[in-house]
């Protein structure tokens, strides 16, 4: 499995409650970074890291550190939407709107492209989309706003829709075998040990879960995670 990869901030998350918490942590981290940028008069993470590396912030009492880029991969969105739909939707939308400047990016996937999973708000804010072969033209419309994906042949055949292209382009994904994936993962694992930040998984309890009796909101832990 992917656990043990040195670049992971947390172990692979399989519990929807923990995943929703991690998303809310990402929103807090994004907002923290943007406040730092505002205070230092920079607009985006690349400029910030260049200035930080050049020592331009050394005169501060507590000089800010280099910020890593973060990529959040959601392998199946429908599971999250069933558990904490409104909270997850709000987090995804917020990160999609402002995360790029802060170096926080989203890859969201689902095998159930229905309108209650890929909501209008999520679609409006995630404008670059890929559709593989789907069962119906309706499913295709949910993903790329037009029919066509139902006619794809499978095996990596896809339609890629980008906001500035006008219409989707048909492209072919490369096949990578399980053995090849495992070899690459094991090689990367051998290079270094991960430094997990597991408090992220319980830093914030989504509101809908708290009301249902799952975990409560812990302001101290939330602030501690947001400072990471």
Please state what every model-predicted region is.
Residues 1-15, 21-24, 121:
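P-loop NTPase switch/communication element
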């Amino acid at each position: 499995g992917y656990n043990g990869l040195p670049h992971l901030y947390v172990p692979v998350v399989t519990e929807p409650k923990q995943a929703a918490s991690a998303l809310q942590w990402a929103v807090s981290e994004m907002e923290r970074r943007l406040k730092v940028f505002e205070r230092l008069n920079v607009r985006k993470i690349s400029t910030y890291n260049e200035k930080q590396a050049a020592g331009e912030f050394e005169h501060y009492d507590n000089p800010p550190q280099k910020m890593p880029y973060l990529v959040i991969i959601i392998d199946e969105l429908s599971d999250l939407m069933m558990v904490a739909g409104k909270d997850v939707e709000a987090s995804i939308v917020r990160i999609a709107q402002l995360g790029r400047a802060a170096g926080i990016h989203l890859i969201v996937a689902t095998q159930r492209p229905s309108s209650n999973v890929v909501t209008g708000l999520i679609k409006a804010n995630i404008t670059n989309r890929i559709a593989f072969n789907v069962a119906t033209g309706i499913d295709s419309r949910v993903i790329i706003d037009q029919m066509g994906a139902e006619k794809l042949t499978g095996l990596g055949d896809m339609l890629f829709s980008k906001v500035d292209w006008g219409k989707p382009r048909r492209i072919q994904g490369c096949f990578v075998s399980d053995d090849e994936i495992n070899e690459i993962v094991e090689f990367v694992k051998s290079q270094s040990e991960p430094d997990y930040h597991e408090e992220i998984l319980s830093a914030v309890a989504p509101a809908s879960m708290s009301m249902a009796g799952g975990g409560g909101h812990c302001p101290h832990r939330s602030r501690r995670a947001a400072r990471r």
